[in-house]
Every structure is written in structure tokens, then in C-alpha cells.
Amino acid sequence: MAAMMMRQKVAGAIAGERRSAVAPKMGRAATAPVVVASANASAFKGAAVTARVKASTRAARVQSRRTAVLTQAKIGDSLAEFLVEATPDPKLRHVMMSMAEATRTIAHKVRTASCAGTACVNSFGDEQLAVDMVADKLLFEALKYSHVCKLACSEEVPEPVDMGGEGFCVAFDPLDGSSSSDTNFAVGTIFGVWPGDKLTNITGREQVAAGMGIYGPRTVFCIALKDAPGCHEFLLMDDGKWMHVKETTHIGEGKMFAPGNLRATFDNPAYERLINFYLGEKYTLRYTGGIVPDLFQIIVKEKGVFTNLTSPTTKAKLRILFEVAPLALLIEKAGGASSCDGKAVSALDIPILVCDQRTQICYGSIGEVRRFEEYMYGTSPRFSEKVVA
């Protein structure tokens, strides 16, 4: 019964997309072909010139449509309208609508489902909560009935599962921070979408889209598409629809920090010096312990830095496939930067060889990531300006 309901919801969401989404608005006035010919020109030459002008006109129209697609997404659009304006790929629109539908259902389950443990752990050793498993099932079902997903895997089911569709592969963390759900902290879903038929031997740079659902006082669906500018926030309205409420294209400088794994400062001197810098410069501490709300605040506030570092006695916990790479696409499309894997490189450029590949990470404004790399590695070759501590 649950599977049938999810199939109906996904089908309804896609049908709603077709009904409500309109083609990008643009001038459609026909341009008459111009024939340039002198009195001595032959009919053949006139026809050739006409053909060239027609071809030029068609090319201009195609370019105009492409430009319009990238510029017409606007605040107040529904998610379906935004996707039509942001990407010409109907399969990508379908997979994003399917993830949005699952996010909407998960929001209800987070408010009502059990927070008790299931007395089992996933293959990574993390305790699985009942609400984790509900979210995981909903996302797998949504992807299966989208018919555009080839493979999917999650933090709870890390081995890729054949979804029976074609077009994309999706990796997701169904409910990051779920251990805090009983305290009523914000929790969230993270996902990345890759083209093709594999989820290893890839990089985050190959993602065509990424997103996160944030379940707090408001339910928000935050997404970025590889070929469209900006990072976009959609608010779940009372009527069950997603409304475009914010576009972020720049993350500036501001004294706000979210330092994860502070225990690493005990035996990571460089991290200790960086934290002392933040404290000495009177940065505002804004850390919830959940990477989804902590990253989302950087996008919404358009400033700040998030760090989660390792040390000889505190190992990496964040997984590139399920968390780090999707969040890196969101942050970088919003105008920020990331630094990953103990190297001064973007998290989008780290090869993902296995599903359980883990890393340390920094996200934030370009200036803050540059400072992070200077403190941790002594240099930041990707960025031209040096940090003055």
C-alpha cells in the first residue's frame, strides 16, 4: 500500500509539473528571412544568402532561448516552473520532482514517526533509527517510480540498487542528524545526482544536480543544477506546493563559524590555531551539530565557514558520496568554496573510489576557505591572495 501511494504521489508530481510549468516566456515574433541580392545576382546566389540568413536567425533564436532559460527563473515560481526554466532535460526535472515529493513526505514523517532505535546498525556502524529507515524507504520508492533513475544508494543501503530506470544515479543520506530529532533540532536529507550508470570512480564535479531538504520550523528544499546559475531555496507552503523564495549567487565575508569535531584540536595544532583565530577575532559561533542546518545557514546568511577536521586520534566521519560532494556543489554554486581530503583542492575534484570514502572538509566563503588552507597547509594555491592573520 505504501509503495502504491508513493507511486501515485510521484506520478501526480510529474503530472502537475506538466500542467503547471509553462514554457519560458520570450519574444516569439517571427523574423522574415532577408534576401540580399543585387540586380545582377542570380537566383542561386539569392537562395544561398537566404539560407545563410535563415541559419543565422535560427542560431540566434536558439541562443536566445538558452539565455532565457538561465535568466527567467524568478522568486515566486513553483518548483515545477523553475525546473522548466532552469533545464531543458525532462528526465532531470523528473528526478528532482521525485526527490521533492519524497522530501515533502519525509517532513511529515519527521514530525510524527518514532525516534527510537531499531536495535540494528548500518554497514558503516551507525545506529539506525526508525525515522532513518522511513526516510530511506521513501526516497528509494520515489526514485524507483520516477523511471529515470538507474542506480541509487544511501548511507543506510550503501551498495547500489538497480532502480529499473535510465538516465541518472542518485546517492543520498536520508536523514542526516537524525540522532538529534528527539531533541527537535533541525535535520535534513542530502542527495547528489550523477549522469550515467555508476556511483564509483566518479567525482563530485560530474554531478548534474544536488540538493538538501531541511526539516525545521520550516520545510525547505534547497537545490543547485550544474548548468544553471545559483543555489535555490524552495519553501513548502500550506497547500503542499514548493515556492521559490531565494536565490544565492554570492557568499561574502562575515565572522560566523561552525566548527565541527573540536576534539581534533587536542592533537591537531594547526586546527587549534585556526579555532583560536576565530575566537580572537570574535567570530559568532553558530553550530548545531548537524551538517545540513550548519551548511544551509552559510547559504542563507551568505557568509561564514564550516569546518570538520581530523587528527591522529579522531578519524574522518563525513562521506564524500553521500554528504561532502553534494553539499560542495550547493556551496560552490552559491558562490562559496570547499577544501577537502587534507589537500588544498575542491571537494568536487576528489575521485570517489568507494561508497564509504571519508574526508575532512571546510566549506564557506572564498576568503574563509583560503584562510583555512593557509592555516592548515601553509598555502592556498587555488586563490591568489594570501590571508593576513
UniProtKB/Swiss-Prot annotation:
User: Does the keyword Secreted feature in the UniProt annotation?
Assistant: no
Cofactors: Mg(2+)
MF terms per GO, please?
metal ion binding; sedoheptulose-bisphosphatase activity
Gene Ontology biological process terms, A to Z: reductive pentose-phosphate cycle
For the ligand (Mg(2+) 3), the binding residues are: 173, 176, 323
Q: In which pathway does it act?
A: Carbohydrate biosynthesis; Calvin cycle
Quote the record's cofactor note. Binds 3 Mg(2+) ions per subunit.
Please provide an example of a Pfam family that matches this protein in its UniProt record.
Answer: FBPase_C
Recorded GO cellular component terms are: chloroplast
Q: Which cysteines are joined by disulfide bonds?
A: 115-120
Where mainly located?
Answer: plastid
Q: Where does substrate bind?
A: 176-179, 287, 317
Q: Where does Mg(2+) 1 bind?
A: 126, 155
Enzyme's top EC category: hydrolase
Keyword Chloroplast in annotation = yes
Q: What's the EC number here?
A: 3.1.3.37
**Positions annotated to bind Mg(2+) 2:** 155, 173, 175
Q: Give UniProt keywords alphabetically.
A: Calvin cycle, Carbohydrate metabolism, Chloroplast, Disulfide bond, Hydrolase, Magnesium, Metal-binding, Plastid, Transit peptide
Catalytic reaction annotation:
D-sedoheptulose 1,7-bisphosphate + H2O = D-sedoheptulose 7-phosphate + phosphate
- Supply the induction statement: Light activation through pH changes, Mg(2+) levels and also by light-modulated reduction of essential disulfide groups via the ferredoxin-thioredoxin f system.
The compartments listed are: Plastid, Chloroplast
Q: Which PANTHER family match?
A: FRUCTOSE-1,6-BISPHOSPHATASE-RELATED, SEDOHEPTULOSE-1,7-BISPHOSPHATASE, CHLOROPLASTIC
Family membership, please give it: Belongs to the FBPase class 1 family.
Quaternary structure annotation from Swiss-Prot or TrEMBL: Homodimer.
What's the protein called, per UniProt? Sedoheptulose-1,7-bisphosphatase, chloroplastic
Q: What is the lineage of its organism?
A: Eukaryota, Viridiplantae, Chlorophyta, core chlorophytes, Chlorophyceae
